[in-house]
């Protein structure tokens, strides 16, 4: 399956997005398609053996939309959109000027024939030139059975124009004495086009700000780089020509061009673009550097490792693009409403016309006509369509700036329903760098010989702590017989036979199967170690525990504060660990979690999460290691810490580039703020249409004698969609 994002131009409202989505998903070979109205893009997953980009383009072309299938250079698409925006601004300016002229003519009595003819000509010019896009797209939508905003504009303006033209012709050729010049609505048709175009210009400007975070990420990609040749000469070449293995030079205060490893030099790097952390990171020989991050005051030579689309920055940009194009589950309801919105509005307009005409034969048909046109003008599927995607774009973009990488909109919505947070201890609550604090020998025999045997066994182990134990022992294994048999049990320990003697290293239950009951000395060392919060591993042979190994991981300085904030949000925070009860309880009490679950083996983590879900809980799992991947995949919301493995990050719905748990609290704040903004936007969009459409139909006329002017309706329609975009932009401040 191919996953690809395409620019989709010509979208005007929620109905446009809904119908184009349906057309794309109906194309053979397409597994899924999402259309983002705010970013004017579509993200399609399709089988390239059954479907081609040309087929996708043809699927939406029939409805008047332009799907760009060529691969644009960086910034090329932005230039194209700016060009279209300038063309839209020119049309808007002309439409507004002509509308003002006509409005003055129509409002300055008496309404003479020359004024009417001038108004008709100016209205025709505006509709044919400035409003041509609405008519072309509206006609195509009508033919394709995919009614959208363009169709509403086409119907309302053409009906008003033709109606006015009819009365003008009647006055000229049939009954000049009938004074029908007072039944002309050229200004309504003109002002409708002007208001809609003006609204589109303002929306485009506001929507550009919703994607500002993504543009800042893209701006972190330098265009050129300094290559250091074997001869010592330095040349400048485009970043696109850099290959892995090349030696590059980073001058002071210069952006790193690709991911790589420092060969020589010392400096600091500002990695806030990648991690969200403002503190500069020291860079020396062997340190990793990342594309888009800023070198400090020192010069560095580094070897290119990941280039082009493989860099961390490029992966982040792709992730953000995909996430911003994704649909929240609530958007599916909006899409269903959008598909029937325009046909329902047209039906309401027709009913309005006939109800007025039948109930008030004297002047009802005239009032009915005005009310029907006003209904067509004031109805706004745009606000409905922009409510969710603009909020998501702002939220996900803001998160990316802070090092919170959200894979899709579902993650934001899932965060709003989570009630239980499961934290893996190692690497999440703690630093993830356990060290051997002490080795308490319990044997009366020479410890050195056993130390070399323990070192020989640990050298063959794949456990992350094996190296730390070998370093803590500080003995040479030369001259020690190779273990004749060796095996490891995940989550329990290892067993090996040296010189015919069987040894075990690991958890108490595993070791006691060989050693029997612990001696008083071993039990005392074990209890003291666990009370201090250390993880204890036992080393034993048949019938005897030889040593107790105390291993401890430093608790992160901010863990307790972050957990307190998370609990204040109403979350139950559970710490999951493979440590024994005493050690686990000591860490849990230190950071203030709601509940501690100890002695959990790696393969049991997913089952524990599933058990919570069976209790009716919505679970978020936070982890950083390979052994967390299954639990992350099982959780309702999966979150990988920045220090974690690639597998954990691939599995997770959210990746925190920082290893600080306070980033987790920031994510939940971001998610809740984004969801609140979506609900506010949808509430406003729905309330606007529920109130505006009946008022436009004339429901207040029997009580107040007031009938809404079509020009005022156009202004309200413009403000409704603009208010939704503005509210989404303001949410960026609330997310800080």
Where are these regions (language model features)?
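Juxtamembrane coupling segments of multi-pass membrane pumps/enzymes
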Residues: 177, 190-252, 283, 406, ...
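Conserved cytosolic catalytic loops of P-type ATPases
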Residues: 28-50, 54, 183-186, 215-310, ...
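Conserved catalytic phosphorylation-site environment of P-type ATPases
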Residues: 274, 333, 370, 380-457, ...
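Transmembrane helix-loop-helix hairpins at the membrane interface
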Residues: 87-224, 336, 343-344, 368, ...
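Flexible metal-binding regulatory segments at protein termini and peripheral loops
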Residues: 1-116, 207, 216, 233-236, ...
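Membrane-embedded alpha-helical bundles of multi-pass transporters
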Residues: 108-112, 143, 162, 398, ...
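ATP-driven catalytic headpiece of P-type ATPases
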Residues: 293, 419-462, 492-574, 653-654, ...
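Conserved ATP-binding TGD loop and adjacent catalytic N/P-domain core of P-type ATPases
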Residues: 1-2, 18, 406, 500, ...
């Amino acid at each position: 399956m191919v996953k690809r994002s395409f620019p989709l131009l010509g979208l005007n409202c929620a109905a446009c997005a809904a119908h184009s989505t349906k057309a794309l998903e109906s194309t053979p070979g397409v597994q899924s398609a999402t259309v983002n109205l705010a970013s004017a893009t579509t993200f399609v997953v399709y089988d390239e053996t059954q479907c081609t980009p040309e087929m996708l383009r043809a699927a939406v072309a029939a409805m008047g939309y332009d799907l760009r299938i060529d691969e644009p250079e960086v910034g090329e698409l932005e230039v194209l959109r700016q060009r279209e925006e300038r063309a839209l601004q020119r049309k808007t300016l002309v439409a507004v000027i002509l509308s003002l002229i006509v409005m003055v003519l129509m409002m300055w009595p008496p309404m003479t024939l020359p004024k009417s003819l001038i108004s008709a000509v100016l209205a025709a010019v505006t509709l044919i030139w400035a409003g041509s896009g609405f008519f072309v797209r509206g006609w195509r939508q009508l033919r394709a059975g995919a009614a959208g905003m363009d169709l509403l504009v086409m119907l309302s303006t053409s009906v008003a124009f033709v109606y006015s033209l009819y009365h003008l012709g009647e006055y000229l050729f049939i009954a000049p004495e009938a004074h029908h010049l007072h039944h002309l609505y050229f200004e309504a048709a003109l002002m409708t086009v002007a208001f809609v175009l003006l609204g589109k210009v303002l929306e485009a400007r506001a929507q550009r700000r919703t994607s500002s975070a993504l543009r800042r990420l893209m701006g972190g990609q330098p265009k050129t780089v300094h290559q250091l040749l074997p001869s010592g000469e330095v040349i400048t070449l485009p970043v696109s020509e850099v290959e892995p293995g090349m030696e590059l030079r980073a001058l002071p205060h210069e952006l790193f061009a690709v991911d790589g490893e420092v060969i020589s030099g010392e400096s600091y790097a500002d990695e806030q673009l990648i991690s969200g952390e403002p503190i500069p990171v020291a860079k020396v020989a062997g340190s990793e550097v990342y594309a888009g991050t800023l070198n400090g005051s020192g010069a560095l030579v580094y070897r290119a490792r990941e280039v082009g689309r493989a860099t961390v920055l490029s992966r982040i940009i792709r992730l953000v693009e995909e996430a911003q194009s994704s649909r929240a589950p609530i958007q599916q309801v909006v899409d269903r409403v959008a598909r029937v919105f325009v046909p329902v509005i047209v039906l309401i307009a027709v009913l309005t016309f006939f109800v007025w005409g039948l109930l008030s034969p004297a002047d009802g048909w005239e009032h009915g006509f005005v009310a029907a046109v006003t209904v067509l003008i004031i109805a706004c599927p745009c606000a409905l369509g922009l409510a969710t995607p603009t909020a998501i774009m702002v939220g996900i973009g803001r998160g990316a700036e802070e090092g919170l990488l959200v894979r899709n909109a579902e993650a934001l919505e899932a965060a709003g329903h989570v009630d239980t947070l499961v934290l893996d201890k190692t690497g999440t609550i703690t630093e993830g760098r356990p060290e051997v604090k002490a080795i308490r020998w319990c044997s009366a025999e020479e410890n050195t010989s056993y130390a070399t045997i323990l070192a020989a066994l640990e050298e063959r182990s794949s456990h992350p702590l094996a190296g730390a134990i070998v370093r803590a022992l500080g003995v040479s294994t030369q001259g020690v017989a190779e273990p004749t048999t060796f095996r490891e049990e995940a989550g329990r320990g290892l067993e090996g036979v040296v010189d015919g003697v069987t040894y075990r290293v690991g958890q108490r239950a595993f070791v006691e199967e060989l050693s029997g009951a612990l001696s008083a000395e071993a039990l005392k060392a074990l209890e003291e170690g666990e009370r201090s919060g250390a993880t204890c591993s036992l080393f034993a042979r048949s019938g005897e525990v030889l040593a107790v190994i105390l291993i401890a991981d430093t608790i992160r300085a901010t863990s307790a504060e972050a957990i307190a904030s998370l609990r204040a949000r109403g979350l139950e925070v559970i710490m999951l660990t493979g440590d024994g009860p005493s050690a686990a309880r000591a860490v849990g009490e230190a950071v203030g979690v709601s509940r501690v679950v100890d002695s959990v083996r790696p393969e049991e983590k997913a089952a524990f999460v599933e058990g919570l879900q069976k209790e009716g809980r919505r679970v978020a799992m936070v982890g950083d290691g390979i052994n967390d991947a299954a639990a992350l995949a099982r959780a309702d919301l999966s979150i990988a810490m920045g220090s974690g493995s690639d597998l954990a990050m691939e599995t997770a719905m959210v990746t925190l580039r920082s290893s600080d748990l306070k980033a987790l609290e920031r994510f939940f704040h971001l998610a809740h703020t984004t969801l609140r903004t979506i609900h506010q936007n949808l509430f406003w969009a729905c309330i606007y249409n529920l109130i505006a459409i009946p008022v436009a139909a004339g429901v207040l006329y029997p009580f107040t004698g007031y009938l809404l002017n079509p020009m005022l309706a156009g202004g309200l329609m413009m403000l409704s969609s603009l208010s939704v975009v503005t509210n989404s932009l303001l949410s960026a401040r609330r997310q800080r």
